[in-house]
Amino acid sequence: MGIEEKLPAGVLLTSVEKLVNWSRKSSVWGATFGLACCAIEMMAAGGPHYDMGRWGMEVFRASPRQADLMIVAGRVSQKMAPVLRQIYDQMAEPRWVLSMGVCASSGGMFNNYAIVQGVDHVVPVDMYLPGCPPRPEMLIDAVLKLREKIMHEPLGPNGRKMLEARKARGDVPVVPYGSMPSSYRSDKARRAEWTKAVREGREEQLRIENWMKAQPHLQQYEGLKK
């Protein structure tokens, strides 16, 4: 009814916002970030049997600057957390994160100091996928749900507000500065401390001590070393 009846065949009416979101959701390229067992299922989903290319995801990019979606497949160690964050920061907007598997979402069975208890402590997550590991069909379903979310994302002033809120949630990682080797590179004092610890063979002890100092709920254990 209405103006649609007066248009010739093959002409569609839409808005710029919906057109942009349609183009975004129809070509979501993933970043290759497989960390553990879930990566096997992720690779299977991209194979010919499941063929994620049907939804414009036939290409996984090794360069974060050419990727739209980071699929964190597997548990994230404390040493890998700053690398993950760096790759996320190198991805251009708009960008999305899918936490694949229970280990990436909440630490899973690895409830210890070496594993980040949820990748949302490091980067903002748009979609959580449970499972240990989730099957390729489950990953495809999560991607399709993420496509629906992308289709309804606002643009213009509302989009800027959403982007600012996302940055406010994700730009301050929980991983404390100075708690792992990669953060020592830009701090001369900490780098000297780390070099000394390496010479004495106690770099792992130093890393754990610095990590515990950065965790308020672990201060009660400081007295056990004395």
UniProtKB/Swiss-Prot annotation:
It is an enzyme of class 7 (translocase). It is found in: Cell membrane. The keyword Ion transport does not apply. Gene3D superfamilies: 3.40.50.12280. Its EC number is 7.1.1.-. One of its GO terms (molecular function) is NADH:ubiquinone reductase (non-electrogenic) activity. Binds 1 [4Fe-4S] cluster. It catalyses: a quinone + NADH + 5 H(+)(in) = a quinol + NAD(+) + 4 H(+)(out). It is a peripheral membrane protein. Its cofactor is [4Fe-4S] cluster. [4Fe-4S] cluster binds at residues 37-38, 103, 132. Its main location: membrane. One of its GO terms (cellular component) is respiratory chain complex I. GO terms for biological process: aerobic respiration; electron transport coupled proton transport. Keywords: 4Fe-4S, Cell membrane, Iron, Iron-sulfur, Membrane, Metal-binding, NAD, Quinone, Translocase, Transport. Belongs to the complex I 20 kDa subunit family. NDH-1 shuttles electrons from NADH, via FMN and iron-sulfur (Fe-S) centers, to quinones in the respiratory chain. The immediate electron acceptor for the enzyme in this species is believed to be a menaquinone. Couples the redox reaction to proton translocation (for every two electrons transferred, four hydrogen ions are translocated across the cytoplasmic membrane), and thus conserves the redox energy in a proton gradient. NDH-1 is composed of 14 different subunits. Subunits NuoB, C, D, E, F, and G constitute the peripheral sector of the complex. This is NADH-quinone oxidoreductase subunit B 2. The gene is nuoB2.
